[in-house]
Curated annotation (Swiss-Prot):
Pfam families named in the record: Trp_syntA
Homology family: Belongs to the TrpA family.
Organism taxonomic ancestry: Bacteria, Pseudomonadati, Pseudomonadota, Betaproteobacteria, Burkholderiales
Species in which this protein is naturally found: Methylibium petroleiphilum (strain ATCC BAA-1232 / LMG 22953 / PM1)
Name the record gives this protein: Tryptophan synthase alpha chain
Gene: trpA
InterPro entries from the UniProt entry: Aldolase_TIM (IPR013785), RibuloseP-bd_barrel (IPR011060), Trp_synthase_alpha_AS (IPR018204), Trp_synthase_suA (IPR002028)
Keyword field contains Transcription regulation: no
Length: 272
């Protein structure tokens, strides 16, 4: 059983919703990423999504786009991202880490090399935003062969066929993009999410995490009744970008602790 699957199984037994924060590797300080990851894990993050910086992050809004630009300006590439995961693993061997990014950095690094190095670094899952499931079965199989979970996106516009395609090859969890558009945009409609998730679960048997538009504890708590996981990205990146180096990890940890408390106070709807 993968580290991600084991985490969700444990949480299911506890009737708790997973908390999955996202940060961009190397932002806001190249030497702070591991400290932020450790602080978030210590504060109650169940899985950490670590964004690989890319110059054209088409699915991301201005907050994460700027974070990518800042990280790239510091020289953060795939090699540096994997080194951060290795460093994190020296202190934490239990919290799953998912690399989230785009095809270009993976292919530029070399797919075979990426899979091997991600495994050796201690990565648990990979989400490539612009790899549609129907076109990357070989890549998904290669990841699974290295005990890495291939993770995919679904959206309000996803067809039944897309859900079936994702359900066939996804492992770990599926990330449901709860809003049309880019990350950090719009207002989250929890009723619409609650209507959509049963449709997804007809085809997808791994846990379903919900992201995009989650900015505070109240929204996260509302989603805890229907989602297996809550994913928060833009709000965290926004909080961290304004912090000085000496306090950035603590601020990240404090925010995660507030979300964790909200999720744990609303367990009645979590699926057994």
């Amino acid at each position: 059983m993968s580290r991600i699957a084991a985490t969700f199984e444990r949480l299911r037994g506890q009737r708790r919703t997973a908390l999955i924060p996202y940060i961009t590797a190397g932002d806001p300080y190249a030497d702070a990423t591991v400290d932020i990851m450790l602080a978030m894990a210590g504060a109650g993050a169940d899985v950490i999504e670590l964004g690989v910086p890319f110059s054209d992050p088409m699915a991301d809004g201005p907050v994460i786009q700027k974070a990518s630009e800042r990280a790239l300006a510091k020289g953060i590439g795939m090699g540096q991202v994997l080194a951060m995961v290795r460093s994190f693993r020296e202190h934490n061997d239990t919290t799953p880490v998912v690399l989230m990014g785009y095809a270009n950095p993976v292919e530029r690094y070399g797919i075979d090399r990426f899979v091997a190095d991600a495994k050796s670094a201690g990565v648990d899952g990979v989400l490539v935003v612009d790899y549609p499931p129907e076109e990357c079965e070989a890549f998904a199989a290669q990841l699974q062969g290295a005990d890495l979970d291939p993770i995919f996106l679904l959206a309000p516009t996803s067809t039944e066929q897309r859900m079936k395609d994702v359900g066939r090859i996804a492992r770990g969890y599926v990330y449901y993009v709860s809003l049309k558009g880019v990350t950090g945009a719009g207002h989250l409609d929890t009723d619409a999410v609650a209507t959509m998730l049963p449709r997804i679960r007809e085809h997808v048997k791994v846990p379903v995490g919900v992201g995009f538009g989650i900015r505070d504890a109240a929204t996260a708590k509302a989603l805890a009744a229907v989602a297996d996981a809550v994913v928060i990205g833009s709000r965290i990146v926004q909080l961290l970008e304004a912090e000085p180096r000496e306090s950035v990890a603590a601020v990240g940890g404090t925010f995660i602790a507030s979300i964790r408390e909200a999720l744990d106070s609303s367990t009645e709807g979590v699926r057994a």
